[in-house]
C-alpha cells in the first residue's frame, strides 16, 4: 500500500511560531525534534511523512495509530526512515516500510510504501 501527503511549509511555520514546543511535541518525539534542527521545511516533511504513513495503513491518525507510534530517523546517507512500534508493526502485519520526502515551492511532500504479510 502507498500513502502520500503534502503540507504547506508556511502553515507549519505559523503553527510552530504560535504554539512552539506544544505543537511539535504533539507529533514528534524528542529525537525527531533534534533531527529537524528548527528547520520549518524539515518539520513539515516529518509531519507529511507521518500522515502519509497513516494513509498507507488506511487508518489515518486516531485510535489505531497515533503520531507518536511512528518514528522517523535518518539513514547513513541522510534518507528518511520510518518505523512503527513493535506493537503496531505486528498489529498491521507490516514487513517493511519505505519512505521519501521532498520539498519545493513552499511545500513538503512525503510518500510511504508499506509491505505487509497479508
Curated annotation (Swiss-Prot):
SUPFAM superfamilies: 4'-phosphopantetheinyl transferase. Its EC number is 2.7.8.7. Pfam families: ACPS. Its main location: cytoplasm. This is Holo-[acyl-carrier-protein] synthase. One of its GO terms (molecular function) is holo-[acyl-carrier-protein] synthase activity. One of its GO terms (cellular component) is cytoplasm. It comes from the Bacteria. The keyword Transferase applies. GO terms for biological process: fatty acid biosynthetic process. The keyword NADP does not apply. Mg(2+) binds at residues 5, 51. It is found in: Cytoplasm. InterPro entries: 4-PPantetheinyl_Trfase_dom, 4-PPantetheinyl_Trfase_dom_sf, ACPS, Ppantetheine-prot_Trfase_dom. It comes from Helicobacter pylori (strain P12). It catalyses: apo-[ACP] + CoA = holo-[ACP] + adenosine 3',5'-bisphosphate + H(+). Signal peptide: none annotated.
Amino acid at each position: 500500500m502507498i500513502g502520500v501527503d503534502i503540507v504547506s511549509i508556511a502553515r507549519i511555520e505559523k503553527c510552530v511560531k504560535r504554539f512552539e514546543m506544544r505543537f511539535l511535541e504533539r507529533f514528534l518525539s524528542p529525537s525527531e525534534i533534534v533531527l529537524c534542527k528548527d528547520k520549518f521545511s524539515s518539520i513539515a516533511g516529518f509531519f507529511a511523512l507521518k500522515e502519509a504513513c497513516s494513509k498507507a495503513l488506511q487508518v489515518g491518525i486516531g485510535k489505531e495509530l497515533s503520531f507518536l507510534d511512528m518514528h522517523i530517523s535518518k539513514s547513513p546517507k541522510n534518507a528518511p526512515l520510518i518505523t512503527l512500534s513493535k506493537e503496531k508493526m505486528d498489529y498491521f502485519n507490516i514487513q517493511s516500510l519505505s519512505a521519501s520526502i521532498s520539498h519545493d515551492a513552499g511545500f513538503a511532500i512525503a510518500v510511504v510504501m508499506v509491505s505487509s504479510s497479508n
